[in-house]
Amino acid sequence: MLPVTARATIDCPREQVFAFVADLANRPAFTDHFIGRFYLERIPSTGVGAAARFRVERRAARMWIETVIDELEPPYMVRERGRGGRQDRIPVHTVWELLTRPGSTTEVSLTFWTEPSHPIDRAKELLGARRWFRRRWSRALRRLKDTLEAGRPVARVQVAGEDRIPTLPSAVRH
C-alpha cells in the first residue's frame, strides 16, 4: 500500500506531544475506534524496543499487527516497524513527525504504509485499504488533539502479570 499521511495541529508543546505519542500504552486512548485487543508485548512501553500487538478491525480484512519502536529522535520523530496479516508476512511501517509551530503549537504528521508481497494480501489492499486507513488515522489524530488539549488523564494499557514489587538482581540478594 502506498503511504497514507494524516496531519493535525495540536495546541501543546512538542515535548508533551512527543512523550504521549512515544508511549505505546497511550495508543488505545485515541485509536480504539479502529484498533481492538491492544496488548503490550514488553513491560517498558516507551523507548526503542517497546512493542505492542493489536487487531485492526477492518471489515474486509481484519488482521493482527505487531509494532515495535525502532527509532526515536526526541522530540522530533518516532519510527515504528512491524509485521501484520496472516503469519505476519506483511511489513508495516509508521512514522510520527512533530514540528514546532508558532504559539507553542505542534504539527503532528503521521505516515503509515504496508508492503504486502503475497498476491492475496495485495488484492485485499486494493479493496479500499488506503482510503480506510487514511480516514481512521485522520480521526485518530483529531482524537489525539482533543485528548492532549483537554489535558484529561487517559487509561493506560498495563502488562498483565507485571510484578508489582520490584525484584532485586541476583547479585544484590543475599
Features from the language model and the residues they span:
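Hydrophobic ligand-binding cavity/cleft-lining segments
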Residues: 1-44, 163-174
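Short glycine/serine/proline-enriched coil/turn segments at secondary-structure junctions
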Residues: 46, 59-61, 86-90
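Hydrophobic/aromatic beta-strand elements that line small-molecule binding cavities or substrate pockets
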Residues: 6-8, 39-40, 56, 64-71, ...
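Intrinsic-disorder/low-complexity, polar/charged segments enriched in Ser/Thr/Lys/Arg/Asp/Glu/Gln
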Residues: 1-9, 15, 51, 64, ...
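Short, flexible loop/turn segments with low-complexity composition
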Residues: 153-165
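A short, structured loop/turn motif at beta-sheet edges
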Residues: 14-15, 43-46, 70-76, 97-107
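Hydrophobic pocket/interface hotspot
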Residues: 17-21, 27, 52-54, 69, ...
